[in-house]
Amino acid sequence: MSYIPELKRRYRDNIVKELVSEFQYKSIMQAPKIEKIVVSMGVGDAVKNKKLLDSAVMELSQITGQKAVKTKAKKAISGFKIRQGQEIGAKVTLRGNMMYEFLYKLVNLALPRVKDFRGINGNAFDGNGNCSFGIAEQIIFSEIDYDKIERISGLNVTIVTTALNDKEGKALLAKFGMPFSN
């Protein structure tokens, strides 16, 4: 018997049944689920200081437990002195057990450490049940050692679901314990 994360077990045993009864699905296969979580960090100053980009990759890897990849600029923006193909950020795509472990850590350990946190804005959804929000400081995660970071920077979290609309997506994430302000 292999290890099953707590949130995955809770989803399988409780959340699916609650969603089926709440939205009157004909089958449990219609219930929305989380497909992936993308955690990204833009490093605008990477143009001048390559060390910042390496530190962002290291921090994302520590936070998520999975190796981060560097992202490149899609097109040149002269105002920001960015050339096409230049490395300007880092991202991690989490699926499976790692995704559930990160979500548990985010909801129960990291978000409660945010100063004056009142919940994630209910308008953080894109119309298709996917939720995107920003975190101002990476130091809310316990894996980051405050003394060893180059600088305090924020990160973006996108939770991609199979929900058909925002109402279903918000209900799914709320059942996982995600705090919403409205």
Curated annotation (Swiss-Prot):
GO terms for molecular function: rRNA binding; structural constituent of ribosome; tRNA binding. Keywords: Ribonucleoprotein, Ribosomal protein, RNA-binding, rRNA-binding, tRNA-binding. Transmembrane segments: none annotated. PROSITE patterns: RIBOSOMAL_L5. One of its GO terms (cellular component) is ribosome. The keyword Ribonucleoprotein applies. One of its GO terms (biological process) is translation. This is one of the proteins that bind and probably mediate the attachment of the 5S RNA into the large ribosomal subunit, where it forms part of the central protuberance. In the 70S ribosome it contacts protein S13 of the 30S subunit (bridge B1b), connecting the 2 subunits; this bridge is implicated in subunit movement. Contacts the P site tRNA; the 5S rRNA and some of its associated proteins might help stabilize positioning of ribosome-bound tRNAs. Part of the 50S ribosomal subunit; part of the 5S rRNA/L5/L18/L25 subcomplex. Contacts the 5S rRNA and the P site tRNA. Forms a bridge to the 30S subunit in the 70S ribosome. Belongs to the universal ribosomal protein uL5 family. This is Large ribosomal subunit protein uL5. It comes from Borrelia duttonii (strain Ly).
